[in-house]
């Protein structure tokens, strides 16, 4: 076989012409030290803060510390087989998560990966989890109510769309129940919900998912779950994943409710990472930027103007206190960042009051401007009355010799507490709340003995649900006109008259209708 040397020569010449002397460039470093989910690496001289880095075992990490010759990396996956000398590569990307409607009804981890066994998530784009909050001129004032369905909250501490209302209290005081009821009550109200679990038990997360399924609320809810068994780095990232998903909907003009359960564990996770990275500790061993951690997270919630999308993110962060100490470091930080707080009392909860909200310490700083007129007119001085009752009730423990006026205030307070008592997973509509508040405002409950108040409340609910026109009118107009006021009054007069006849040994002459 003859060899065509000219042909070979031409092939070689063409290859030389097309050859480009380009080296495959990749920044790599070496692991110096590894332990407790923290890696110290050298050689990554151009790495960014919060950049994702890839280890040779396929796990990712995130840079949190940048020093002269080394960088501190927190692991986001398995690190057991990473050892000194292992290779680590830059990705030149920050942590980003999928966003969009494909996340509704799904349970994801802090990295945006599905963990509910329902297959891959369909999404159009990913967004970085760190973003600067909207500026002052991009925001709009809070003017629409976010209906929680909890009578005590909607009447005394109303929450507006775009507000940040803290739920604070000890363990087992009903904090999560308020958040769940708020989500259940958004059904049919075109509000998307996000629930962020931070360092919670897996059994608690499963129970929560089952509750949402039971009430058909999972279809408009996204759950970001970072359990107690996850790495501190994932507990740290979870709230930022949640708010990033919410921001995408807000930018499209939609309303979002996001709940962080809870930020106490978030602060502990960040403290753990900071101490392992050898950052200098401050008060209660928290790092110096712990306030900034929560402020930059919560400032991303709010209501934005039409030019920027016109949507809103309402945030309900939860803080767990120890022995009712709201003056501790993290509680005072978050109280100063948020637009109000609902303080849950242990002794109220143990006495059977649900929700166990302290009317004296709780406040909503911007929600009243978003309250509908029907509830605003009927709630009146309810908060003041309850605060007076709590004060007098504590004072009355010291002596039995009370004047008539004090006894009347205490009696009225007991009745109001019974009336605003509400079982979990039974949210009220705003029209029904206005009717129940009407019975307090117009002093109809004074004719009913304390022991019969809860039964009378059920009678009110049944009676007005049958008289649909009154509730429908309030729902449509969001107000109580003079004609409607008279109509409601007549209904109550007939209801009271018929109800007191069913009470044994009741003195009918006592009623002044």
UniProtKB/Swiss-Prot annotation:
| Top EC class of this enzyme | translocase
Q: Where is this site: Required for activity?
A: 362
Membrane topology classification: Peripheral membrane protein
Per UniProt, which keywords does this protein have? ATP synthesis, ATP-binding, Cell membrane, CF(1), Hydrogen ion transport, Ion transport, Membrane, Nucleotide-binding, Translocase, Transport
Tell me where it resides. Answer: Cell membrane
Q: Does the keyword Metal-binding apply?
A: no
E.C. numbers: 7.1.2.2
Q: Which family does it belong to?
A: Belongs to the ATPase alpha/beta chains family.
Q: Which protein is depicted? A: ATP synthase subunit alpha
Which taxonomic lineage is given here? Bacteria, Bacillati, Mycoplasmatota, Mycoplasmoidales, Mycoplasmoidaceae
């Amino acid at each position: 076989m003859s060899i065509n040397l000219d042909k070979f020569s031409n092939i070689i010449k063409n290859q030389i012409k097309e050859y480009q002397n380009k080296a495959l460039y990749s920044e790599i470093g070496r692991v110096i030290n590894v332990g407790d989910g923290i890696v110290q690496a050298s050689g990554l001289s151009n790495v960014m803060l919060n950049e994702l880095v890839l280890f040779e075992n396929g796990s990712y990490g995130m840079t949190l510390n940048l020093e002269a010759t080394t960088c501190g990396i927190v692991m986001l996956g398995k690190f057991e087989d990473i050892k000194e000398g292992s290779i680590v590569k830059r990705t030149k990307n920050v942590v980003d998560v999928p966003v969009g409607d494909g996340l509704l009804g799904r349970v994801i981890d802090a990295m945006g990966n599905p963990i509910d066994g329902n297959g891959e998530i369909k999404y159009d784009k990913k967004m970085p989890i760190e973003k600067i909050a909207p500026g002052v001129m991009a925001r709009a004032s809070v003017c629409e109510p976010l209906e929680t369905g909890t009578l005590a909250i909607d009447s005394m501490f109303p929450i507006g769309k775009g507000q940040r209302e803290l739920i604070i209290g000890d363990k087992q005081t009903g904090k999560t129940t308020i958040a769940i009821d708020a989500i259940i009550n958004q059904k049919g109200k075109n509000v998307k919900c996000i629930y962020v679990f931070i360092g919670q038990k897996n059994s608690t997360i499963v129970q929560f998912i089952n509750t949402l399924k039971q009430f058909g609320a999972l279809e408009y809810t996204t759950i970001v779950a970072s359990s107690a068994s996850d790495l501190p780095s994932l507990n740290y990232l979870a709230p930022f994943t949640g708010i990033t998903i919410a921001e995408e909907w807000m930018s499209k003009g939609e309303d979002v409710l996001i709940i962080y359960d809870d930020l106490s564990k978030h602060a502990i996770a960040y403290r753990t990472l900071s101490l392992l990275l050898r950052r200098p500790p401050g008060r209660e061993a928290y790092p110096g930027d712990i306030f900034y951690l929560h402020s930059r997270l919560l400032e991303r919630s709010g209501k934005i103007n039409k030019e920027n999308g016109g949507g809103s993110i309402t945030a309900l962060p939860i803080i767990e206190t120890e022995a009712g100490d709201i003056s501790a470091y993290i509680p005072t930080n978050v109280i100063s960042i948020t637009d109000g707080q609902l303080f849950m009392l242990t002794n109220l909860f143990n006495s059977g009051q649900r929700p166990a909200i302290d009317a004296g310490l709780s406040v909503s700083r911007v929600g009243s401007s978003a309250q509908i007129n029907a509830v605003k007119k009927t709630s009146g001085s309810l908060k003041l009355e309850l605060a007076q009752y709590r004060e007098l009730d504590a004072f009355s423990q010291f002596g039995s010799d009370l004047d008539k006026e004090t006894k009347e205030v205490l009696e009225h307070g007991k009745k109001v507490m019974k009336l605003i008592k509400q079982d979990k997973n039974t949210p009220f509509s705003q029209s029904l709340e206005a009717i129940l508040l009407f019975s307090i405002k117009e002093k109809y409950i004074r004719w009913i003995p304390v022991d019969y108040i809860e039964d009378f409340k059920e009678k009110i609910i049944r009676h007005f649900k049958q008289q649909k026109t009154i509730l429908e009118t309030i729902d449509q107009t969001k107000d109580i006109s003079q004609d409607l006021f008279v109509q409601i009054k007549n209904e109550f007069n007939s209801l009271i008259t018929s109800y007191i006849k069913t009470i044994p040994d009741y003195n009918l002459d006592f009623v002044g209708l």
